[in-house]
Amino acid sequence: MAIKLIAIDMDGTLLLPDHTISPAVKATIAAARERGVNVVLTTGRPYAGVHSYLKELHMEQPGDYCITYNGALVQKAGDGSTVAQTALSYDDYRFLEQLSREVGSHFHALDRNTLYTANRDISYYTVHESYVATIPLVFCEAEKMDPEIQLLKVMMIDEPAILDKAIARIPAEVKEKYTVLKSAPYFLEILDKRVNKGTGVKSLADALGIKPEEIMAIGDQENDIAMIEFAGVGVAMDNAIPAVKEAANFITKSNLEDGVAFAIEKYVLA
């Protein structure tokens, strides 16, 4: 069955290490779109960290979409307006922020427009997230957060060795109550239990009348597994972690070798 939608992770997949898109990848995405295929950037980033790439790829038309915050938000690519949203509550935030202190990790939280931290010793990785995602960073003590806030995800962030120790201390019931997954060695993302990239892709596909077998998903990290398993064609980058490769139907080349282009050529343009 022909592919009608391609869901592409950004960091480690679409993007080179310097956060640029190679000419070959741009060309194959454009060729797929010319054939009427929906190409959807599917990322843990907020819209602000995606918009410049959507513009670069000319993916801001009325029928273009993006999936942000690891599936918590499905948006129209042109203006960022909401198609579907699933958020964490203030009570979730207070519980998880306290948990981060108990397990020994830095912590931050994101709504649609702002990155919040209650850590006075703000982590380098929080600053890094603010820079890469081009989203403002605000210090706010946990008890002073707006009780009506709609947080799309929270994150434990730290040096990989410290974060791994913190993860090992997280009670099993927390991992059952929320979606808990790694997006990088220094990022642990925690979302509403109903949220992952797979549910985000499904929500959009249902709205567009596209079947799972008509979808290709490409990724490299733990947070990509759900959409790779959901898609009819799940593709792992050669630079992907082992669990992603195990979940995939096909292993393409690395992001340094235009792996996204190779997969699109094989399954869409051939």
Please annotate each region the language model reported.
Residues 23-124:
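Active-site phosphate-binding/coordination module
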Residues 99-218, 239:
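Conserved acidic, metal-coordinating active-site core of Asp-based
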Residues 25, 50-54, 166, 170, ...:
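Hydrophobic packing residues within well-ordered alpha-helices of enzyme cores
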Residues 1-5, 22, 189-270:
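Mg2+-dependent phosphoryl-transfer enzymes with acidic/Ser/Thr/Gly-rich catalytic loops
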Residues 62, 70, 174-176, 230-231, ...:
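Short, structured coil segments at secondary-structure junctions
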Residues 4-17:
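Asp-based phosphoryl-transfer active-site loop
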Residues 36-40, 64, 153, 213-214, ...:
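Short active-site oxyanion
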Residues 32, 43, 70, 154, ...:
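Residue-level signal for inorganic ion chemistry
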